């Protein structure tokens, strides 16, 4: 009789824990996701602070995602982590060392999905 109670108790615990998994993630179609990058100021100046903001369309991206900016001039990468801004965007501060045309690869990580989108920032 004690064994049956023990098995029943374990079964109830397993059922309760399986219900605590939260809402299932909404599937993301990688082909539908677009990324855009904006800067403040709109035209960055070398050696001055710049705030970059990455936003996404084609999928609902939340604070559960991670976004990294891969900034390159002459193929020299500099990785910058972003912070979710609460309004669907991810922001990071950066100082561009010199004028030029920088390639910025926006890396989006959601669960086991990794997407990379490319943008360009022209610095004066």
State the predicted function of each range.
Residues 21-23:
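Bacterial signal peptide processing site
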Residues 115-123:
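Edge beta-strands of extracellular beta-sandwich domains
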Residues 86-91:
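Aromatic sugar-binding surface patches on proteins
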Residues 56, 68-81:
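Short amphipathic beta-strand segments in non-cytosolic proteins
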Residues 16-19:
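C-terminal motif of bacterial Sec signal peptides marking the signal peptidase cleavage site
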Residues 46-60, 106:
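Beta-strand-rich structural segments
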Residues 27-47:
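N-terminal edge beta-strand
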